[in-house]
Amino acid sequence: MDELQDVQLTEIKPLLNDKNGTRNFQDFDCQEHDIETAHGMVHVTIRGLPKGNRPVILTYHDIGLNHKSCFNAFFNFEDMQEITQHFAVCHVDAPGQQEGAPSFPTGYQYPTMDELAEMLPPVLTHLNLKSIIGIGVGAGAYILSRFALNHPELVEGLVLINVDPCAKGWIDWAASKLSGLTTNVVDIILSHHFGQEELQANLDLIQTYRLHIAQDINQENLQLFLGSYNGRKDLEIERPILGQNDNKSKTLKCSTLLVVGDSSPAVEAVVECNSRLNPVNTTLLKMADCGGLPQVVQPGKLTEAFKYFLQGMGYIPSASMTRLARSRTHSTSSSIGSGESAFSRSVASNQSDGTQESSESPDVLDRHQTMEVSC
């Protein structure tokens, strides 16, 4: 039986080695579009040209960020070029979050999270894109999940970083309202992205993003996006029961890679999401020694995982795992379940020892095993 996969990897080279990190926010060889939808205008940035019938990689950022600060460090990373030469990339900025965005008029009703997801089909139609492989972080991961649930025929795969499938509870909602009266919105956003350990230890990274959130993002528009995210509904996804028709279960049908740093504030939410998804096509990647922005601070390991993911979908089969080969001397304990997802098959080919299996309820697709991964 296919099993769920839970992997821990370690990356030892930080990306932000300059104090301001601004070079990592730059766009290169991109085209920008403002596309009108039923729920308002959306700003998108295209990098590269679509390759035949291949899907495009579509990204959606988290609150307090835009596509530049959320993803450019990852896509500008050297090893990612092996992927981007095979795929066009479409970065989507939530309304009013792009660089230089003007304030919305007084009384403007910001789209709900569900409406933000429904802004994506017109984007694909306008750009003549047939399907996507989505990469979302936080709020963006939620939006792409909702999009995939509503339009499964348009989504071939998802990489969901720090995803929270749950609605905000009323206690959390009240606490956020109270904290909003007493706390700077920048601090609220930072605590969403980073845990206390990272806030105190990684001062250069925190300062880079503190300045970005405060100076580069329109504060009024940010408050609206934050309010929309805090008002999200539960995704209401559920794990299929063995023997039950998958069409009767509300779950993601595409290959899905869940990613979270082991010290991220989102760990519990991602684990909860993991428990609701079908283990046949889901992989959980828990990155060791990593905080809230794995695509920024550990791009090498995330790139490697993404390559495996794409290989399992039948793309870039000749992609070399050079970073894995270079770091084979660093061994980490990992909790893995071998599914038929991209990452699972590739990791399984690099195992050296046997497995230890734990018993689970037989009617739910949720068995686990422990392996040693050299990476």
UniProtKB/Swiss-Prot annotation:
The modification Phosphothreonine is found at T322, T329, T332, T355. The modification N-acetylmethionine is found at M1. GO terms for cellular component: cytoplasm. Keywords: Acetylation, Phosphoprotein. The keyword Transmembrane helix does not apply. InterPro entries: AB_hydrolase_fold, NDRG. GO terms for biological process: signal transduction. Residues 364-375 have a biased composition (Basic and acidic residues). Residues 347-361 have a biased composition (Polar residues). Residues 330-346 have a biased composition (Low complexity). The modification Phosphoserine is found at S331, S334, S335, S338, S341, S352, S361, S374. Residues 327-375 are annotated as: Disordered. Belongs to the NDRG family. This is Protein NDRG3. It comes from Bos taurus. The gene is NDRG3.
